C-alpha cells in the first residue's frame, strides 16, 4: 500500500522536496529483506532500534506496506521475555544479548504509526508486543532510576548509558500514550518513567561518562527529559565542540568526522525546544551526504574530504525523513519528538534520596 498524495509527504523548502523525501524512503524499502527486516544496508546486519527508525521513516513517506512488514518483523521475532537480539544478519542471530534501548524503541515506532495512520487494528495487534517489551525494559531499572543498558543470559550489565536511557524515557512515554489509547492503564510504567526522567535530569553521576560523543550532548533534550532553560543551556554549552558550520555535527568531539544521523537528531532536539533557525540550518548542512538515488552516506571525514565509513546507511536516510517531518509539520506524527500529548508519568510523585535529604 502506497499513500499516493505527495502533499502528505514532508518537504523542506530550499533543501528537500517531497519527491526527494519519497525517493529516500524508497531507498530504505529497497534494502528490506523478505522477512521484513530493514538492515543497515543491503546485506548488512539488522538491529531492533534502527529497524524501527527505518519503519517510522517509511510511515512518514507513505510507504505503508513495507512499514507494516517491518512492524510484523518486530512481532514475529520478539522473544518470549519481550526482548530482541542486539544483532541479526539475514535471519541469523549474531549477538543474542538484549539492549534495553533497542527493545524499548518499538513503542515509539508503534505509537508514531498509529498517530499517522489512525489504524486501531494495527494498535491492537502491536499492543501486546509493546507491553512485553516495556515490561522487559522496566525490569532492568536500577535503584537510582536509571536503566541498565543490556542483559545477557548471565544477568544484567549494571551500567547505564545516558543516551540509551534518554531514548528509553521517550519510548516509555510513547508506550503510555498507546496504553491510554488502548484503555490499559500502566501505573508501574508511570512510576518507572518518572524515576528515569529524574535520574537523567538530576543525576549525571548515575551514567557511564561518554562525553566525547555528540549523542550524550543532545539526547537528554531529544528524549524530552530536559526542556526549557535547562535544555537550551545544555545545547548551548557544547555547541562549538560539535557543530561544524556548513557540514553538520561531529560524531565525537575530537575527530574531524561529521555524521548525518546525529545531525538530524540534533535537528529534532532543536525543534523540540523551539530553536527553529538553528534546526533548519543544521538540516540543510547535512545534505552534502545525499546521493542521486536518495540514499545518504553515514558521514564525512572533512579534513580529507572522504566518506567514512564507506556505506550508505538506511537509518541515516530515516533520521533525515523524521527531521524533515518535524520541521515541515507535515504528518500527524510530526510532533512525536516534541513530546506532543505524551504522558510524563509520575514526575515528582516519589521519593528520591536527593530530595528527602533536603527536607
Curated annotation (Swiss-Prot):
Catalytic activities: Endohydrolysis of 3-O-methyl-alpha-D-mannosyl-(1->4)-3-O-methyl-D-mannose linkages within (1,4)-3-O-methyl-alpha-D-mannnan substrates
Temperature dependence: Optimum temperature is 45 degrees Celsius.
Domain of life: Bacteria
Subunit field text: Monomer in solution.
Gene this chain is encoded by: mmpH
Transmembrane parts of this sequence: none
Alphabetical GO biological process terms: carbohydrate metabolic process
Molecular function as annotated in GO: hydrolase activity
Enzyme class: hydrolase
Name listed for the protein in its UniProt record: MMP endo-(1,4)-3-O-methyl-alpha-D-mannosidase
Entry-linked Gene3D superfamilies: 1.50.10.10
Function in brief: Hydrolase involved in the biosynthesis of 3-O-methylmannose polysaccharides (MMP), which are intracellular polymethylated polysaccharides implicated in the modulation of fatty acid metabolism in non-tuberculous mycobacteria. Highly specific hydrolase that catalyzes the internal cleavage of MMP. Is able to hydrolyze purified MMP into distinct lower order oligomannosides but does not cleave acylated or deacylated forms of 6-O-methylglucose lipopolysaccharide (MGLP), beta-mannans, synthetic 4alpha-oligomannosides or its own reaction products.
The enzyme's E.C. designation: 3.2.1.221
Record's keyword terms, sorted: Carbohydrate metabolism, Hydrolase
Variation of activity with pH: Optimum pH is 6.5.
Amino acid at each position: 500500500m502506497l499513500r499516493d498524495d505527495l502533499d502528505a509527504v514532508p518537504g523542506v523548502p530550499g533543501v528537500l522536496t517531497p519527491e526527494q523525501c519519497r525517493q529516500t524512503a524508497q531507498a530504505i524499502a529497497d534494502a528490506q529483506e523478505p522477512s521484513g527486516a530493514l538492515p543497515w544496508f543491503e546485506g548488512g546486519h539488522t538491529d531492533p532500534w534502527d529497524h524501527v527508525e527505518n519503519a517510522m521513516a517509511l510511515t512518514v513517506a507513505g510507504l505503508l506496506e513495507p512499514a507494516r512488514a517491518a512492524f510484523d518483523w518486530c512481532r514475529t521475532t520478539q522473544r518470549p521475555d519481550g526482548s530482541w537480539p542486539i544483532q541479526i544478519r539475514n535471519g541469523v542471530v549474531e549477538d543474542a544479548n538484549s539492549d534495553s534501548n533497542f527493545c524499548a524503541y518499538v513503542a515509539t515506532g508503534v505509537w508514531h504509526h498509529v498517530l499517522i495512520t489512525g489504524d486501531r487494528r494495527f494498535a491492537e495487534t502491536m499492543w501486546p508486543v509493546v507491553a512485553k517489551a516495556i515490561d522487559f525494559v522496566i525490569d532492568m531499572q536500577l535503584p537510582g532510576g536509571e536503566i541498565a543498558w543490556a542483559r545477557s543470559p548471565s544477568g544484567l550489565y549494571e551500567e547505564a548509558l545516558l543516551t540509551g536511557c534518554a531514548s528509553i524515557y521517550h519510548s516509555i512515554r510513547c508506550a503510555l500514550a498507546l496504553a491510554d489509547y488502548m484503555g490499559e492503564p500502566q501505573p508501574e510504567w508511570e512510576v518507572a518513567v518518572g524515576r528515569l526522567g529524574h535520574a537523567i535530569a538530576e543525576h549525571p553521576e548515575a551514567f557511564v561518562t561518554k562525553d566525547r560523543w555528540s549523542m550524550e550532548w543532545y539526547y537528554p533534550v531529544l528524549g524530552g527529559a530536559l526542556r526549557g532553560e535547562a535544555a537550551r543551556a545544555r545545547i548551548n554549552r557544547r555547541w562549538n565542540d560539535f557543530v561544524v558550520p556548513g557540514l553538520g555535527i561531529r560524531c565525537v568531539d575530537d575527530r574531524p568526522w561529521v555524521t548525518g544521523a546525529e545531525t538530524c537528531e540534533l535537528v529534532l532536539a532543536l525543534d523540540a525546544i523551539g530553536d527553529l533557525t538553528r534546526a533548519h540550518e543544521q538540516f540543510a548542512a547535512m545534505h552534502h551526504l545525499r546521493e542521486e538515488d536518495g540514499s545518504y552516506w553515514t558521514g564525512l571525514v572533512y579534513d580529507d574530504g572522504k566518506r567514512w565509513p564507506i556505506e550508505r546507511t538506511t537509518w541515516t536516510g530515516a533520521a533525515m525523513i523524521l527531521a524533515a517531518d518535524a520541521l515541515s509539520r507535515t504528518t500527524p506524527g510530526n510532533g512525536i519528538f516534541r513530546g506532543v500529548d505524551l504522558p510524563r508519568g509520575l514526575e515528582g510523585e516519589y521519593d528520591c534520596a536527593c530530595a528527602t535529604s533536603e527536607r
